[in-house]
């Protein structure tokens, strides 16, 4: 959650319209939080498109910067998480709106968060990796000019995500650890640092260095500030136990994660992370058909959202599973598709770089 500041009238006039200074009634604050809890647990629900306007009005009356940010970001998240037509234009417009708001209230953290966590990540989801990288590098240049460590940390977060999407995991981890270093050695607050600990641990596991993961996962759990942080760390524990050959512990950890998703509605938007770990678990323990069934469900969802980048990675996983099932001809066809898509992506990236 962004640090809370009180909006001065001049900022409200510039950003949100003319508002008269007033004493905030505690009833208004309670009503605002109740309204938020009622309508904003699921960012993919169309109700947020109208509810966000109402929440913004409430936030203005309460002089609440945090709720103003949430209200402005609600429409952005609706499109970011895969809803509505003209998504790209809507995401860009929403990011720019949030960045303008952040500059007007002097919130550099929000400014770079909108740029990194929404615009850069959106391009990653769309498979536009070079555009994402260009945006992340522009961010870093701007942040270094300003000289604020918290802004630079947000840029490291963005660069880590881009390199992970490009399959350059060691490079991705390098930027994760840079962000972690800023968090551990300065007074910079990183709300989502728990996820960076978890993600860095997962890369160690994937690189066959799982002995380095437990310390990072302990730090991840210690830094938890939301259900999403907690479930992210626990999902990585599933991968750790699988790497250690402890399938019993892996199954227990997976069941714990399933229960966490069932108990917390706000995790619905992140359900794909659970599915990915379920696929990996079933694959590793030999439940190949079950893994393929979950994978097919994921493919259907990704096609609906037109998430082509993740779809191709998933098909590579499907090919790996089919190969282990000795269905080598089917696997070979998927491998060819994957390599062809990689070639096309390289050509697209070269065009972007030339442009």
State the predicted function of each range:
Residues 26, 66, 70, 109-111, ...:
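Residue signature of alpha-solenoid helical repeat architecture, marking inter-repeat boundaries
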Residues 35, 75, 118-119, 152, ...:
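Structural register within alpha-helical repeat arrays
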Residues 53-60, 96-103, 137-144, 177-188, ...:
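Amphipathic alpha-helical segments of tetratricopeptide repeats
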Residues 30, 70-71, 113-114, 154, ...:
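Residue register of alpha-helical TPR repeats
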Residues 1-36, 159:
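Bacterial Sec-dependent N-terminal signal peptides
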Residues 19-77, 84-96, 104-109:
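N-terminal leader/linker segments that initiate helical-solenoid repeat arrays
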Residues 22-34, 38, 45-49, 89, ...:
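Hydrophobic positions within repeat-based interaction scaffolds
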Residues 37-47, 79-91, 120-132, 163-171, ...:
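Short coil/turn connectors between adjacent alpha-helices in alpha-solenoid helical repeat scaffolds
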